[in-house]
Amino acid sequence: MRAVIQRVKKSWVEVDGKVVGSINEGLNVFLGVRKGDTEEDIEKLVNKILNLRIFEDERGKFQYSVLDIKGEILVVSQFTLYANVKKGRRPSFEEAEEPKRAKELYEKFVDKIKESGLKVETGIFGAMMDVFIENWGPVTIIIDSREI
């Protein structure tokens, strides 16, 4: 499971011109599910995201997590995080999980992160989405569950 995490001042996602998820200060999380991912990957990734100290204290040091600041989280599915561009010019997505299983794990990820008590919003799995992000920093971090 792979997540691209961006610290944001605000972020929202639209489908067919309608806002389906919107947050203020917190994290935008693009989530990709890889073949072979399990609930253990969800546990590790959620724990890392919730406790990652990427919010600054008064001295400008990364001291606080999204939990500490009681921030908000927008989770958007993105299978293209598993693009392979080694051959040719068209990316291959062979490493990405099949849609049915990917949706199941994505929903479990969202449920797990909601257990934090923070406001959590989402896009719509499998939909063509327009994502609007006001980066804060910018701070962008890529985390792969198999590397933590």
UniProtKB/Swiss-Prot annotation:
It is found in: Cytoplasm. It catalyses: glycyl-tRNA(Ala) + H2O = tRNA(Ala) + glycine + H(+); a D-aminoacyl-tRNA + H2O = a tRNA + a D-alpha-amino acid + H(+). The keyword Metal-binding does not apply. A Gly-cisPro motif from one monomer fits into the active site of the other monomer to allow specific chiral rejection of L-amino acids. CDD domains: Dtyr_deacylase. This is D-aminoacyl-tRNA deacylase. An aminoacyl-tRNA editing enzyme that deacylates mischarged D-aminoacyl-tRNAs. Also deacylates mischarged glycyl-tRNA(Ala), protecting cells against glycine mischarging by AlaRS. Acts via tRNA-based rather than protein-based catalysis; rejects L-amino acids rather than detecting D-amino acids in the active site. By recycling D-aminoacyl-tRNA to D-amino acids and free tRNA molecules, this enzyme counteracts the toxicity associated with the formation of D-aminoacyl-tRNA entities in vivo and helps enforce protein L-homochirality. GO terms for biological process: D-amino acid catabolic process; tRNA metabolic process. HAMAP family: Deacylase_Dtd. The lineage of its organism: Bacteria, Pseudomonadati, Aquificota, Aquificia, Aquificales. It comes from the Bacteria.
